[in-house]
């Protein structure tokens, strides 16, 4: 579903993130694909905007400066691309190590307690690859 400021265009009382959101990332026509790789950033933005909407303050548009893909290709191989045109930066063992780090450290859910959950949602924690 298309989103603007993480708000579902067709149903403005709903905010979307991650696999459910096809979000504009800039004013150049780039969009975050409907993928779990954007869930942390989109989730933080959607949470902020849902709270802003409840408080009646302006929403912040979702922004994503860059786009990366790290695709697992089996037991010992992967490929890492950067940019909206997906230029290959790494492949093989080095990309596989990056993929393991992403899967085990970057996108791992926070521990089930309030302080860690709120810390995980901080804008400053989000990475512009």
Residue ranges of predicted features:
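FAD-site-proximal beta/loop scaffold in flavoenzymes
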Residues: 1-40
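Short, electropositive, low-hydrophobicity segments enriched in small/polar residues
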Residues: 22, 47, 78
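A structure-centric signal for secondary-structure junctions around beta-strands
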Residues: 11, 65-67
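SDR active-site lid
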Residues: 21-23, 30, 57, 63, ...
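Internal hydrophobic alpha-helix adjacent to the cofactor/substrate pocket in enzyme cavities
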Residues: 35-64
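C-terminal auxiliary extensions adjacent to catalytic cores
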Residues: 75-129
């Amino acid at each position: 579903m298309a989103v603007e400021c993480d708000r579902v265009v067709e149903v403005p009382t709903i905010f979307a993130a991650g696999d459910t959101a096809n979000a504009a990332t800039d004013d150049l026509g780039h969009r975050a694909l409907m993928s779990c790789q954007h869930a942390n950033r989109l989730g933080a933005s959607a949470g902020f905007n849902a709270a802003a909407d409840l408080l009646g303050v302006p929403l912040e548009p979702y922004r994503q400066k860059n786009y990366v893909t790290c695709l697992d290709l089996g037991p010992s191989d992967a490929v890492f691309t950067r940019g909206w045109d997906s230029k290959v930066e790494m492949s093989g063992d080095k990309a596989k190590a990056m993929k393991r780090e992403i899967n085990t450290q970057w996108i791992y859910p926070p521990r089930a307690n309030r302080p860690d959950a709120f810390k995980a949602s901080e804008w400053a924690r989000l990475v512009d690859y």
